[in-house]
Every structure is written in structure tokens, then in C-alpha cells.
Amino acid sequence: MSDQAQTSMNQYLTFTLAGEQYAVEVGKVKEVLEYTSVTKVPRTLEFMRGVINLRGSVVPVIDLRLKFDLGETEKTIDTSIIVMEVEISGETVVLGTLADSVQEVIGMDSSQIEPAPSIGTSIKTDFIQGIGKQEDQFIMILDIDAVFSEAEISVVAEHAEPAR
């Protein structure tokens, strides 16, 4: 068997948070939106910025920078909302995550991805699926299903409609 047949190529959407490169599997991403006004929801988690109306569906919007203790996302011309499907305990929830900017879709095979380090990252490593190497930069590949606890997702899901 050739080396190419043994490595699997995966597609990732890359984006920035606080100057660092992150990525999520394209299969988790439903769409990318320009930043739009977010309706605040009182008495909710600090990192939940509010909800948006997405073609008649209520979608909660999460600030990943706040979740990762990187400070609040500032709205700029590049700020985007990445609409994703997150699965926890067998339930799929659609939510939007704020990104400072969305970069591109890249392909990486398993040889370009190292296991998450236990030190030296600004976020807890159980959120990190691995560290991708693309040319001379590192990209933290998030396991978006592990970013939120079951309790956090249940609070967020109260403001969302079920995934279709």
C-alpha cells in the first residue's frame, strides 16, 4: 500500500482568535456569516453573546475568545460568525461562534497533525484535537464537540432550535 493511501486528507476551516490560527473540521461547519447584530439574552453564560435569526431559526452566538479567556471579540470588518453543528450526549445543537476573521479551507493529512501539547497553549488542551503544521505556522485544530461541557450546551440549547 502506498503512503498516500495510508494517510487520510481532512478539510478544515481556518480562522483567527486573538492573533492565533485555529481550525475546525469542515463537516461541522454549516456556513460562515458576516458579523450581524446579536440580540443579547439576559442571565446567561458570560461567553454567550446572544442569538441571531438565521432564516427563521434562533441560533445562539458564542464568543470563543471569552470561552478561552482571550478577551472579548472586537467587532471589525473581518469579524465573522461561523455557524456549526456541535454534538454532545447524542444531541446536535446549531450555534454560531465569533471569529476575528475567517481564513480559508485547507486540507491536511494525518502526517501534518501532531497531538495536542500538555503545556504551552493558551486554552485547555482537551479542546484541541491536534496541532496542524501548514508551511511555517501552527494551527490549533479544535474538537468543537469538546469545547463546551454538557451543562454549558444545555444552557445554550435553551436558546436554540433543534438542528434540522
What is each model feature region?
Residues 1-164:
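An acidic, low-aromatic, low-complexity terminal/linker signal
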